[in-house]
Amino acid sequence: MTRETALETLADSRRRIDELDLRILELLNARARVVEDIGRAKRILKMPIYEPRREDEVYENITRHNGGPLPSGAVKRVFERIIDEMRNVQKLRMLDKRDNG
């Protein structure tokens, strides 16, 4: 690879990363909207926000479907963070008394 080719590859790869980041953001917000629905339902059903068994199911599902190159441990850590933030979204929805179901 020449210097010129390397610079082109770098610029193109960064552009693709920016596009992927926007897609990830779109998916995270779509997931948060679903989590809001779950929060509403859990509030009505008087269920807890934290359900360790359900979270374990999510981790098992994503690691089972992981085709790499990201190691499954790394994928799980990313999802742990996502789920933690989604739990916060769910808490806010469950505390929102304006939505009476």
Language model features by range: what are they?
Residues 1-101:
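Domain-level signature for soluble enzymes in the chorismate/prephenate branch of the shikimate pathway
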